[in-house]
């Protein structure tokens, strides 16, 4: 005899209702996972208990992505069904409020999960998805950190090269300046050495003896000036008279 059809109605007994909810919830999550694996379908399931406790399953890595995709699809479908009616239609603020409230609750719950809080209601599959999300986030964080460290290292290397080039230029300029100063100092020393050479000392004048006839020409006063055409004999006679003049003076003294 076959089993009779169970009448669907609210279970009044709280304990029986909670037990039934736990069994049916586990079966529902299992069926959602089976259809996702067997049929390669994207499945998302959200269940709230009578106490407001949330249970969910998603074949994607994040429930938020599925909800955003559903919202885009629903909006596009509504646009196709009534392209002109939305212009004059009044917005349903109650539905908009409920949608935003659910989205905020979902974001807050995901944030608690990322912080390691409120993990008791999560199943093994949910924990694996959360772990995968955290690992992906850590990979992105490490990649960004390594990129910043690499950029900082390259900046420091470029700064070091610039400082080395500037140091080389300054060293070259200092050497050139030292060479110029050394050359100028050498030139100054040579000039000072040339100025320090003592001038030739004048020889003391020796008076000739009266009895000695000097072969050097004595100074004389040339009143008329000398010309190249003058008689050379007259010049020699004048020189001889001037040379013998001291002897004549001396003999004249004895004659007197």
Curated annotation (Swiss-Prot):
Limits of the K-box domain: 90-180
GO annotation terms (biological process): cell differentiation; floral meristem determinacy; positive regulation of transcription by RNA polymerase II
Subunit structure: Homodimer capable of binding to CArG-box sequences.
Domain MADS-box: 1-61
One MF annotation (Gene Ontology) recorded for this entry: DNA-binding transcription factor activity
Chain's gene name: CAL
GO cellular component, one term: nucleus
Phylogenetic classification of the source organism: Eukaryota, Viridiplantae, Streptophyta, Embryophyta, Tracheophyta
Alphabetized UniProt keyword annotations: Activator, Coiled coil, Developmental protein, Differentiation, DNA-binding, Flowering, Nucleus, Transcription, Transcription regulation
Source species: Arabidopsis lyrata subsp. lyrata (Lyre-leaved rock-cress)
Name recorded for this polypeptide: Transcription factor CAULIFLOWER
Alphabetical list of SUPFAM superfamilies matching this protein: SRF-like
């Amino acid at each position: 005899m076959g089993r009779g059809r169970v009448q669907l109605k609210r279970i009044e007994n709280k304990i029986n209702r909670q037990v039934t909810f736990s069994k049916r919830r586990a079966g529902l999550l299992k069926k959602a996972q089976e259809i996702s694996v067997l049929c390669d379908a994207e499945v998302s399931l959200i269940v709230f208990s009578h106490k407001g406790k949330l249970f969910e399953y998603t074949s994607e890595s994040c429930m938020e992505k599925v909800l955003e995709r559903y919202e885009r699809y629903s909006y596009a479908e509504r646009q196709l069904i009534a392209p002109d009616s939305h212009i004059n239609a009044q917005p349903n603020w109650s539905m908009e409020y409920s949608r935003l409230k659910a989205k905020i609750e979902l974001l807050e719950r995901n944030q608690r999960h990322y912080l390691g809080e409120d993990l008791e209601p999560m199943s093994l599959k949910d924990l694996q998805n959360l772990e995968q999300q955290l690992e992906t986030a850590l990979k992105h964080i490490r990649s960004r950190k390594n990129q910043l460290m690499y950029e900082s290292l390259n900046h420091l290397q470029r700064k070091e090269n610039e400082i080395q080039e500037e140091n080389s230029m300054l060293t070259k300029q200092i050497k050139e300046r030292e060479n110029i100063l050394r050359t100028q100092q050498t030139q100054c020393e040579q000039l000072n050495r040339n100025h320090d050479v003592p001038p030739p000392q004048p020889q003391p004048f020796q008076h000739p003896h009266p009895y000695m006839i000097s072969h050097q020409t004595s100074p004389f006063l040339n009143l008329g000036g000398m010309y190249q055409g003058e008689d050379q004999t007259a010049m020699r006679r004048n020189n001889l008279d001037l040379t013998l003049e001291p002897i004549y003076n001396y003999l004249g003294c004895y004659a007197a």
